[in-house]
């Protein structure tokens, strides 16, 4: 490539110290001492010229020529004088730079600028000179205080127009980066090896400079200054005005230096192999790679890997040589059967990976990303066990694992039935597609033979093939697409939501993975981090898919109601919208993977304790199934069937050594636990089992095992569990006016009981006193009941005239026992009204009759909740008859048969109807006697 020569100019000449060569783009320090008066004079002249030519007196605008001393071993044009080198009696070391003449100077040098002057505090200082461009000394015109001469400069071309130079430039870059890498790795060797080292920070800076350099001449000069070379070789490079020749020379020096470093590494028992870059100019030009060089013997050190790292200890290079990791990665990606979008991205990243040096941080990032793509199950699925016995097997599995929970089981069996029918349809469609493809294949072969034998074109064959293709596409469109439901199980803790999801996976024969969402506050935990972040990784969904290795697992999203809200880290609940939307999750995009992933085959089952904290858009995407707390009967069944055998086994006992009766379990449930689930019940059973284990061990160790009684009675519970923690109300044998038995369901869920409503009157001014730690709603129920009784006191026979106030000169006190327990809710309205009527009329309510329901000012009895728990508690307390709102008739149908048989359930819709059932002997008006105007709009 032709160089650009500038006109001749006159500038000061600075002879460089011995064995020193300054190249363009390089900064050099030149010491100014008493032995170099010429430099002081030159610097004074530069300052004077700068002061006269520039406003600020900047000395870096005044050029000088830095010229090295000549060498007797090299000619003026850079040719090595081998033939007469031995005849030279004077060497460059014998020349004093301060007294150098034109004959002592090398013809080539560098035009430079003085970038700074550093003082040392001892009277000496140092010049900082930066090379700018090559120059040729044409003539020395002054040699008084300092040298001055006429020089011509040569500038490198700005554009690369030669293909050969461009290829050499790429080879120079590869070798330069290899050189930096091997210097960095050599720093890990013992210092006694003599191999130069390189800090990680400097290595990264050099690697960045090499990658960003656009000019081959500048990079060649820079690397020539770094690489180890002789004084004469540097002079030769200084004379190479042609960029192509200069780059080739530096490639030669780099190749030699790399070889020397590798040999040094071998001496320190490091088994080396050839790096995957060209090692000589010819190989660099043609892109060839030398074969690996076997290390002598079996080194005990760490062999150097072709990928730029270290391999394991021991063995030689041939034994420890691993397969090319890029090829292995390509095989894994091919085996993963990526989606079209993922395959396109993987191909692009593989090409990038081949161009990235293994020592670069980007190499590890790209490799990790490709490994993640290979580990995601794009098409791998678990075959669902959907045979003729699918529903029976699943029903049996769910019944064995969980007692009750009929609504959940019903929904899951519906899903299995739909899945089974869809699979049958798809199997039939697949057989038709296969048959049609075979027919089209035979027709295609015959058409090819006919076309080879006959010249005319048969248009009928094309029409037939087109019709067959249309039919094939129509058949493929008939395939049923499975969209798994997204279920939300809502219920109190300990009712089996998590274990139910695991049973579903077992019944389906699918893999199961649990994702805990409690406390997740960062959107990136769901969607993953961008690859641009340090230590980025995919989100919980993609990590779960990688772990199970199939595209159709059962994912349990545990505690979805406890996901953090919107913050500076994003909104994780909003990130779940795409995951849990059946219409969108077939194209779920993780920030790290950044490729659409199909989640439509995943069966998501979420759990929550409450719906209050779940955002409405997220709740709308899930099918909510409520799991109420277990009743006492259900707890007893679960304990006898699951918990007792489990705890006996855990504590080293068997059923013959401890006998739990249903009565004992019922007492533990009623008197020692009050919860919706069975976790505390299991703990109490475990405590009893441990106590019996101590008794059995003592009897066995004493040699009198016959003294041990395996039978467990109700009276033994206080010894193992202490005094009873909860007391159950029992229906009284006798009754008195003003006392009514109400029903209550505990807020913990699963338990219910009776609650006495006590009303007393006293002389007063019509005030009402409420006690028993009653809530606001319960207080309002008392006010509504009292208002209705006062309004209908004349019809009830409580006053002599309609205008008489029954509360005149009277005050009442309403109390609910268990005053330390908070009570609230509207369900005691009917009980309050009946209790007030009983007090004012002096008629007692039957003690074995209980009631629940909300009352309105019109006297209507409206529906309440917790019917199942309340009635089970009523039966346990000895109640015989229960008054329920007519609107709760549907809830009574779901009661256990034991409750239906043990209670007389009466449904009432108005307070007058309830009064007639409570006191059937009285003459009471009907609610129809007091018609009301109601809007039907």
Curated annotation (Swiss-Prot):
One family name in Pfam for this protein: Lon_lid
Protein name: Lon protease homolog 2, peroxisomal
Residues of the active site: 827, 870
Ranges spanned by the short sequence motif Microbody targeting signal, renumbered to the chain: 935-937
Domain (Lon N-terminal) ranges: 11-258
Entry keyword Hydrolase: yes
Family assignment from sequence similarity: Belongs to the peptidase S16 family.
Cell compartment(s), UniProt: Peroxisome matrix
Summary of the function given for this chain in its UniProt record: ATP-dependent serine protease that mediates the selective degradation of misfolded and unassembled polypeptides in the peroxisomal matrix. Necessary for type 2 peroxisome targeting signal (PTS2)-containing protein processing and facilitates peroxisome matrix protein import.
Principal location class: other
Cellular component GO terms held in the UniProt record: peroxisomal matrix
Amino acids binding ATP: 491-498
Residue ranges of domain Lon proteolytic in the record: 734-921
Catalysed reaction, written as an equation: Hydrolysis of proteins in presence of ATP
Gene Ontology molecular function: ATP binding; ATP hydrolysis activity; ATP-dependent peptidase activity; serine-type endopeptidase activity
GO BP of this protein: protein import into peroxisome matrix; protein processing; protein quality control for misfolded or incompletely synthesized proteins; protein targeting to peroxisome
E.C. number(s) listed in UniProt: 3.4.21.53
SUPFAM superfamilies for this protein: P-loop containing nucleoside triphosphate hydrolases (SSF52540), PUA domain-like (SSF88697), Ribosomal protein S5 domain 2-like (SSF54211)
Domain of life of the native organism: Eukaryota
Keyword list, A-Z: ATP-binding, Hydrolase, Nucleotide-binding, Peroxisome, Protease, Serine protease
């Amino acid at each position: 490539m032709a160089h650009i020569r500038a006109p001749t100019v006159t500038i000061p000449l600075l002879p460089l110290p011995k064995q020193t060569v300054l190249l363009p783009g390089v900064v050099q320090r030149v010491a100014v001492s008493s032995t170099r008066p010429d430099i002081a004079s030159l610097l004074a002249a530069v300052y004077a010229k700068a002061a006269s030519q520039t406003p600020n007196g900047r000395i870096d605008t005044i050029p000088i020529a830095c010229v090295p001393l000549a060498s007797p071993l090299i000619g003026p044009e850079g040719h090595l004088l081998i033939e007469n080198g031995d005849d030279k009696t004077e060497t460059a070391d014998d020349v004093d730079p301060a007294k150098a003449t034109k004959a002592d100077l090398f013809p080539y040098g560098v035009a430079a600028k003085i970038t700074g002057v550093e003082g040392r505090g001892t009277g000496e200082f140092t010049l900082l000179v930066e090379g700018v461009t090559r120059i040729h000394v044409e003539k020395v015109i002054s040699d008084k205080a300092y040298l001055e001469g006429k020089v011509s400069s040569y500038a490198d071309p700005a554009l690369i127009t030669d293909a050969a130079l461009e290829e050499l430039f790429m080879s120079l870059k590869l070798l330069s980066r290899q050189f930096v890498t091997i210097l960095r790795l050599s720093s890990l060797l013992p210092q006694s090896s003599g191999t130069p080292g390189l800090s990680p920070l400097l290595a990264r800076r050099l690697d960045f400079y090499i990658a960003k350099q656009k000019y081959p001449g500048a990079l060649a000069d820079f690397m020539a200054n770094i690489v180890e070379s002789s004084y004469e070789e540097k002079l030769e490079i200084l004379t190479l005005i042609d960029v192509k020749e200069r780059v080739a020379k530096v490639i030669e020096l780099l190749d030699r230096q790399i070889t020397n470093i590798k040999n040094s590494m071998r001496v320190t028992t490091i088994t080396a192999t050839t790096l995957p870059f060209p090692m000589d100019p010819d190989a660099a030009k043609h892109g060839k790679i030398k074969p690996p060089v076997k290390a002598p013997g079996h080194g005990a050190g760490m062999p150097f890997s072709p990928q730029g790292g270290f391999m394991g200890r021991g063995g030689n290079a041939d034994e420890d040589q691993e397969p090319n990791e890029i090829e292995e990665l390509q095989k894994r990606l091919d085996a993963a059967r990526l989606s079209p979008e993922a395959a396109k991205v993987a191909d692009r990243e593989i090409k990038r990976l081949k161009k990235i040096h293994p020592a670069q941080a980007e190499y590890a990032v790209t490799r990790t990303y490709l490994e993640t793509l290979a580990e995601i199950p794009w098409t791998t699925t678990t075959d669902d066990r959907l045979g003729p016995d699918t529903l029976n097997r699943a029903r049996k599995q769910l019944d064995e694992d969980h007692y009750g929970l009929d609504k959940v089981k019903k929904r899951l069996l519906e899903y299995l039935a739909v899945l089974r029918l869809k699979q049958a349809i798809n199997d039939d469609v697949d057989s038709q597609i296969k048959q049609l493809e075979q027919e089209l294949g035979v027709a295609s072969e015959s058409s090819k033979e006919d076309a080879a034998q006959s010249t005319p074109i048969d248009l009928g064959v094309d029409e037939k093939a087109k019709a067959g293709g249309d039919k094939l596409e129509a058949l493929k469109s008939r395939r049923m697409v499975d969209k798994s439901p997204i279920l939300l199980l809502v219920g109190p803790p300990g009712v089996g939501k998590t274990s139910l999801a695991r049973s579903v996976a077992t019944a389906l024969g699918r893999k199961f993975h649990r994702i805990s969402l409690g406390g997740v506050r960062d959107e990136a935990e769901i969607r993953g981090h961008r690859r641009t972040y340090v230590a980025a990784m995919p989100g919980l969904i993609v990590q779960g898919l990688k772990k199970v290795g199939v595209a159709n697992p059962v994912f349990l999203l545990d505690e979805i109601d406890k996901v953090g809200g919107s913050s500076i880290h994003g909104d994780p609940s909003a990130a779940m919208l795409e995951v849990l939307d059946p219409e969108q999750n077939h194209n779920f995009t993780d920030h790290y993977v950044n490729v659409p992933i199909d989640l439509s085959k995943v069966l998501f089952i979420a759990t929550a304790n409450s719906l209050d904290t779940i955002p409405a858009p997220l709740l709308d995407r899930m099918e909510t199934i409520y799991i109420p707390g277990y009743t006492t009967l259900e707890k007893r069944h679960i304990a006898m069937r699951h918990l007792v055998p489990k705890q006996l086994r855990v504590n080293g006992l068997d059923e013959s050594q401890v006998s739990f009766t249903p009565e004992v379990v019922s007492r533990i449930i009623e008197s020692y636990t009050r919860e919706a689930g069975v976790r505390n019940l299991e703990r109490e059973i475990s405590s009893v089992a441990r106590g019996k284990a101590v008794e059995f061990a003592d009897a066995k160790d004493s040699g009198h095992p016959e003294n041990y009684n395996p039978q467990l009675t109700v009276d033994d519970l206080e010894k193992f569990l202490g005094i009873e923690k909860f007391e159950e109300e029992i229906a009284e044998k006798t009754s008195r006016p003003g006392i009514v038995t109400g029903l209550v369901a505990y807020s913990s869920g699963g338990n219910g009981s009776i609650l006495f409503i006590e009303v007393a009157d006293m002389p007063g001014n019509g005030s009402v006193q409420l006690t028993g730690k009653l809530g606001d709603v319960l207080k309002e129920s008392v006010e509504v009941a009292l208002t209705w009784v006062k309004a209908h006191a004349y019809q009830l026979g409580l006053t002599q005239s309609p205008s008489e106030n029954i509360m005149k000169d009277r005050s009442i006190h309403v109390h609910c026992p268990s005053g330390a327990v908070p009570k609230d809710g509207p369900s005691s309205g009917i009980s309050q009204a009946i209790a007030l009527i009983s007090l004012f009329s002096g008629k007692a309510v039957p003690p074995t009759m209980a009631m629940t329901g909300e009352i309105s000012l019109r006297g209507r009895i409206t529906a309440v909740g917790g019917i199942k728990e309340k009635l089970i508690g009523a039966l346990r307390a000895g109640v015989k008859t229960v008054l329920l709102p007519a609107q709760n008739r549907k809830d009574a149908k779901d009661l256990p048969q034991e409750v239906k048989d043990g209670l007389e359930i009466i449904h009432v819709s108005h307070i007058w109807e309830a009064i007639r059932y409570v006191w059937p002997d009285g003459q009471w008006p009907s609610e129809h006697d007091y018609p009301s105007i109601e809007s039907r709009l």
